[in-house]
Amino acid sequence: MAKGKDIRVIVILECTGCDKKSVNKESTGISRYITKKNRQNTPSRLELRKFCPRCCKHTIHAEIKK
């Protein structure tokens, strides 16, 4: 049995470019990815460059709260 909190946690990454873009236009949604991270190796918020189908380019996806 595992003790305490799990080391690996599920996090949600959200596109930072879609937020700024959808202010003037109708909301087309926000690109989100689900991944896991190791709490011991990366205690801070995770930021990765991923492809955003809404922006049609690679943008920074940042971790959000659940």
From Swiss-Prot:
CC annotations in GO: chloroplast; ribonucleoprotein complex; ribosome
Keyword Ribonucleoprotein appears in the UniProt entry: yes
Signal peptide stretch: none
GO terms of molecular function: structural constituent of ribosome
Keyword Ribosomal protein tagged: yes
Annotated keywords: Chloroplast, Plastid, Ribonucleoprotein, Ribosomal protein
PROSITE patterns the record matches: RIBOSOMAL_L33
Pfam families: Ribosomal_L33 (PF00471)
GO biological process annotation, one example: translation
Listed InterPro entries: Ribosomal_bL33, Ribosomal_bL33_CS, Ribosomal_bL33_sf, Ribosomal_zn-bd
Record's subcellular location: Plastid, Chloroplast
Family according to the record: Belongs to the bacterial ribosomal protein bL33 family.
Name of this protein: Large ribosomal subunit protein bL33c
Organism field: Glycine max
